[in-house]
Structures are given as C-alpha cells and as structure tokens.
Amino acid sequence: MTLFESIVLGVVQGLTEFLPVSSTAHLRIIPALAGWEDPGAAFTAVVQLGTLAAVLIYFYKDIYAILAAVIQGIMKGRPFDTHEAAMGWMIAVGTLPIVICGLLFKTEIETSLRSLYWVSGALIGFALLLLVAEWSVKKRLKQNMSMTSMDTIGWKEAIFTGFAQCLALIPGASRSGVTITGGLFLNMSRESAARFSFLLSLPSVFAAALFELYHTWDIIASSAGSIAAITAATITAGITGYLSIAFLISYLKKHTTSIFIIYRIILGAGILSLIAAGRLQP
C-alpha cells in the first residue's frame, strides 16, 4: 500500500466511520474500484485508533464525567449512585455482546463476510431497517410522546443497543447505523441515539484495534513503509473523524436520517450493478 493510498483510505475511514453509511463498505469498495489491494479487516481495525481519538477528543467532557462518577461510586460502595456512574456500567455491559460475537466469528468477518454481495445486501437491508425506525419515530411524534434523552437512558436502551451493535460486524451494516437504528426503535431522540452510539463504540473499537495491532505487528514492523502508511491513515482518520462527528450531531438535531437511507440504497444497488457488469469482483 502506497502512502497516497493510505491517506485516501484514512480520509474515507474518518468521514464514513461515524456516518450511518458503513466505513467498512467504503474501505472495501474504493480499493476495488481503484484497482488497489483490499486493505483487509486488520487495517480497518488499527486505523480505527484514529477515529477512537476523535471520539475521545469530541466527548472528553462526557467521558471524564462518566469515569469520575464510576470511580467515586466504587470508592463509596454505591456503583450506581449517579446517572453518570450508571452510564459507565451500561456502556461496559453493552460492549460485551460485540466482544463475544467478534471473537466467535472473527474468521467469517475477515473472509466470507467481506464479499461485496454481503456488503451491498447489508447496505440496502439495514437502510430499510433504519427507514422503519424513522417511521416509528414519526408515529410517536404524532402522538406527542416524549423522546428518551441522554439523561434518561436506562439499562433497557443500553443492553438492546449493545446487541444491535453486534450487527455492525457485518461489513456494510455500519456501527453507527445499527446502533442509531436500535436507539430510534427504543424512542431515543436522533441526537441522543448518535451520542450514545459513539460512547458505546469506545471500548469495542479500542479492544479491536489493540487486538489486531498485536496480531499484525510483526508484519507491520517488518516494513517502514507499512508503519508510515498506517500512521498516515490513522492521523487522517482522526482529523476527518472529528469533523464527521461534529457534522452528524449538528445535522441530527434538525434532520432525519433520510439522506443516509437514500445514499445506502443507491450505493448498494450501484455495487450490484457494477458486479453484474463485470466492473467489480465480488
């Protein structure tokens, strides 16, 4: 992988990691269209350290408040004393499903599930599921039902969203896409669903990145070019990832996810068309 390719893929990773359009799908598609080598699931996981940094920087106040509350709660012997403390434990419990599924299906995730048929199917299928979630939100708003905010998220929302996050292991599904969808089904506001989605992603993204870095370090370290490429991709992913978070949080305050639903369906259909025309190899 050249330095130029790594920077391009880093930008793509950062821009698409937090939008509900699937960064994995784009990292699978763009190299195929450009005639580049598939960077692989390990590259994606390691570069996510950049987007992880973006979340840490953007939500540093929330993260500090949660960690401080968890520590104080443990020291006082009342681990769920405040909502911030409970939020920390909810994020921890909500992370367990994807960790277990990720380890159980690691081989499939890195091989057969990276087929463009799976990617396009996930793009379209989960777009339709997000559409149904938006319909449910619209129906509840017509009934003047109050929406769940970050201050009122409970164990039900955390556990359900945690299981929904497992679907993000399917390339094309989108981590933010499936967790925001889960949040909308549970009556969370779009902004709150996105915020909780990003906070919930922290432990699993960090663990996955370290896991892949540990298992691929010998290959990476054997080439100065590999280290430079991954470093460049990680830095660009972090910068563009921060901008992507800021955009999505602001956008969802006033808009639905319709634009992302339409984009996913068009992209998924486009991939299938290119495969049928022989322009892409599945």
Swiss-Prot record:
It is an enzyme of class 3 (hydrolase). Its main location: membrane. GO terms for molecular function: undecaprenyl-diphosphatase activity. It is found in: Cell inner membrane. One of its GO terms (cellular component) is plasma membrane. Keywords: Antibiotic resistance, Cell inner membrane, Cell membrane, Cell shape, Cell wall biogenesis/degradation, Hydrolase, Membrane, Peptidoglycan synthesis, Transmembrane, Transmembrane helix. The chain crosses the membrane at residues 1-21, 40-60, 85-105, 117-137, 196-216, 229-249, 258-278. Belongs to the UppP family. Bacitracin is thought to be involved in the inhibition of peptidoglycan synthesis by sequestering undecaprenyl diphosphate, thereby reducing the pool of lipid carrier available. This is Undecaprenyl-diphosphatase. It comes from Chlorobium phaeobacteroides (strain DSM 266 / SMG 266 / 2430). The lineage of its organism: Bacteria, Pseudomonadati, Chlorobiota, Chlorobiia, Chlorobiales.
